[in-house]
C-alpha cells in the first residue's frame, strides 16, 4: 500500500514537471513559430520531467520522504527512462528531422535516419575507450556503460559552462570593468553611422541613374553575352556612364561598415545604461556580488589547480569540512553532524534551483540565437539532449556535496562508476574554460575602447 502511495506522489510530481516543460516550450522556445511538431514537444517535456525528478529524489533522500525501497525503485526506473531518451530516442529524431529538411533524401528519410543514429552510437560508444570510467566487471550491455558515457559528455558541458560563468559573472556585475562612455562618444559614433548611410543612399542613387541612362541608350538589351561580355562589363564602361560593378562593391563595403557601426552604437548605449544602473542601490548590490564572485572564481581556480597537481578528490562534503574547520578554530561546542545535514540540504536545494534556472535561461538565449523555422525542431531536440546530459551529470557531481550517509543510494543506483574521475575531469575542463574565458574577456575589454576611439 505504501508503495502505491509513494508511486502516486512521484507520478503526480512528474505530471507537474511535464506540464511546466510543456509551458516553457510553448511560451518561450516556440512562441514565435507556428509550425510545431508535437513529438518534439513531448520529447522535450518528458526529458525535462525526468531530469527534474532526479533532483526531486535527491531532496527526498535527504528529507527521508517516501519509503527507501520506493525511492530506490523510482531512482532505477527514472535513470533507465532518461538514458533511453538520451541515447536512443532523441538522437534518432534529431537525425530524422535533419534528413526531413533535405529534399533529396525525403522519400528514404527513415533509412537515412537509422544510418545517422548508428553513426552516433558508434562514436558514442568509442567515447568511453580513452577514459577510465568503468569497473572491469561491468558487461557491455549494463546500464553503467550508458551512464558513464553520458556522464563524460555532461560533465564536460557543465565544466565549460561553469568555467565561463565563474569569470563572466564578476565581469558582468562589477562596475570596475565598465568603460567610461559619454554622450559625446555616442553622438560621434551616431554621426559616423549617419554619414555612412548618406553615402550608401548617394551611391545607390548613382546606380539607379546609371541604370536608367543605360536602359535609355539600349545598353541593357544589347549587352554582349558570354565570358568576354562579362569581363567587358566588369572592366569597362561606356563613355559618360558609371561602372556599376565597382559602385556595387563600394555599397556592399559601406553596408557592412554601417552594420558594424550600428552594433557598436547599440553596445555604447547598453554600456551607458549599465553605468547608470550601477549607481542605483540594486546596481551597487550586484557590484558587491561581483567582488564576491571574483573571490570565488580565484578560489575555485586555485582549488582546481591544487586538485589536478596533487591528484586528489575531497572525501568530505564541503559543508561538513567547512563547519569542522570553523569549530576547531573557534574551539566551541557544536553538533557538526546535525547542522551539516540541514545546511547541506539548503545548499543542495540552492544548487538544484540555480542549475535548473540557469540552464533554462541559457537554453532560451541559445535557441533564439541560432534557430529558424526549418531548424527549430532539431535545435530543440539538441537542447533536450544537452539538458538531460547536464542533469544526469549534476547528479554525479552533486553526490560529493552530500553527507556520506545520503550518497549510498546514488552509488547503488549509478553502479560502481569511477566517481573520482568525473571530479578530476571537471576540474581540468573548468580550469581550461576559466583561463580561456579570462584571456578572451581581457582581449575584448582591451580592444573595445580602441575600437570606439577609431576615426
UniProtKB/Swiss-Prot annotation:
One of its GO terms (molecular function) is voltage-gated monoatomic anion channel activity. Belongs to the Golgi pH regulator (TC 1.A.38) family. Disruption phenotype: Delayed transport of newly synthesized protein from the Golgi to the plasma membrane, impaired glycosylation of proteins along the exocytic pathway, and structural disorganization of the Golgi apparatus. Defects are associated with decreased acidification of the cisternae of the Golgi and trans-Golgi network by 0.4-0.5 pH units with no effect on lysosomal pH and no effect on endocytosis or recycling. Glycans are attached at residues 180, 243. This is Golgi pH regulator. It comes from Cricetulus griseus. Signal peptide: none annotated. Homotrimer. Interacts with RABL3; the interaction stabilizes GPR89B. Voltage-gated channel that enables the transfer of anions such as iodide, chloride, bromide and fluoride which may function in counter-ion conductance and participates in Golgi acidification. Plays a role in lymphocyte development, probably by acting as a RABL3 effector in hematopoietic cells. GO terms for biological process: intracellular pH reduction; protein transport; T cell differentiation. It catalyses: iodide(out) = iodide(in); chloride(in) = chloride(out); bromide(in) = bromide(out); fluoride(in) = fluoride(out). GO terms for cellular component: Golgi cisterna membrane; Golgi membrane; monoatomic ion channel complex. InterPro entries: ABA_GPCR_dom, Golgi_pH-regulator_cons_dom, GPHR/GTG. Keywords: Glycoprotein, Golgi apparatus, Ion channel, Ion transport, Membrane, Protein transport, Transmembrane, Transmembrane helix, Transport, Voltage-gated channel.
Amino acid at each position: 500500500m505504501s508503495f502505491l502511495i509513494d508511486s502516486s506522489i512521484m507520478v503526480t510530481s512528474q505530471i507537474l514537471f511535464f506540464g511546466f516543460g510543456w509551458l516553457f516550450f510553448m511560451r518561450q522556445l516556440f512562441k514565435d513559430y507556428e509550425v510545431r511538431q508535437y513529438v518534439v514537444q513531448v520529447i522535450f517535456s518528458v526529458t525535462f520531467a525526468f531530469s527534474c525528478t532526479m533532483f526531486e529524489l535527491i531532496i527526498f533522500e535527504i528529507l527521508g520522504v517516501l519509503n527507501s525501497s520506493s525511492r530506490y525503485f523510482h531512482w532505477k526506473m527514472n535513470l533507465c527512462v532518461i538514458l533511453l531518451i538520451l541515447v536512443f530516442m532523441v538522437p534518432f529524431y534529431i537525425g530524422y528531422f535533419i534528413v526531413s529538411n533535405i529534399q533529396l533524401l525525403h522519400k528514404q528519410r527513415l533509412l537515412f535516419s537509422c544510418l545517422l543514429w548508428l553513426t552516433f552510437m558508434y562514436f558514442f560508444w568509442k567515447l568511453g575507450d580513452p577514459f577510465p570510467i568503468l569497473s572491469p566487471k561491468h558487461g557491455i550491455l549494463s546500464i553503467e556503460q550508458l551512464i558513464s558515457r553520458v556522464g563524460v559528455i555532461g560533465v564536460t558541458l557543465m565544466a565549460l559552462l561553469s568555467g565561463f560563468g565563474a569569470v563572466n559573472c564578476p565581469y558582468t556585475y562589477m562596475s570596475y570593468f565598465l568603460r567610461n562612455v559619454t554622450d559625446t562618444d555616442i553622438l560621434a559614433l551616431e554621426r559616423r553611422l549617419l554619414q555612412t548611410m548618406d553615402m550608401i543612399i548617394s551611391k545607390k542613387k548613382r546606380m539607379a541613374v546609371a541604370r536608367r541612362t543605360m536602359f535609355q541608350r539600349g545598353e541593357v538589351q544589347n549587352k554582349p553575352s558570354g565570358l568576354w561580355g562579362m569581363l567587358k562589363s566588369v572592366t569597362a564602361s561606356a563613355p559618360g556612364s558609371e561602372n556599376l560593378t565597382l559602385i556595387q562593391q563600394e555599397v556592399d563595403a559601406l553596408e557592412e561598415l554601417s552594420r558594424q557601426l550600428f552594433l557598436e552604437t547599440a553596445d555604447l548605449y547598453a554600456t551607458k545604461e549599465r553605468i547608470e544602473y550601477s549607481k542605483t542601490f540594486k546596481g551597487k548590490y550586484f557590484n558587491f556580488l561581483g567582488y564576491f564572485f571574483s573571490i570565488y572564481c580565484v578560489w575555485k581556480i586555485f582549488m582546481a589547480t591544487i586538485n589536478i597537481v596533487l591528484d586528489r578528490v575531497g572525501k568530505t562534503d564541503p559543508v561538513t569540512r567547512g563547519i569542522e574547520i570553523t569549530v576547531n578554530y573557534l574551539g566551541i561546542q557544536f553538533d557538526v553532524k546535525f547542522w551539516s545535514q540541514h545546511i547541506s540540504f539548503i545548499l543542495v536545494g540552492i544548487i538544484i534551483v540555480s542549475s535548473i534556472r540557469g540552464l533554462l535561461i541559457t537554453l532560451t538565449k541559445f535557441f533564439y540565437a541560432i534557430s529558424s523555422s526549418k531548424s527549430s525542431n532539431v535545435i530543440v531536440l539538441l537542447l533536450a539532449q544537452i539538458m538531460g546530459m547536464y542533469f544526469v551529470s549534476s547528479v554525479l557531481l552533486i553526490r560529493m556535496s552530500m553527507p556520506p550517509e545520503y550518497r549510498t543510494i546514488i552509488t547503488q543506483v549509478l553502479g560502481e562508476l569511477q566517481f573520482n574521475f568525473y571530479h578530476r575531469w571537471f576540474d581540468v575542463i573548468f580550469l581550461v574554460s576559466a583561463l580561456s574565458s579570462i584571456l578572451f574577456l581581457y582581449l575584448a575589454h582591451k580592444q573595445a575602447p580602441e575600437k570606439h576611439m577609431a576615426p
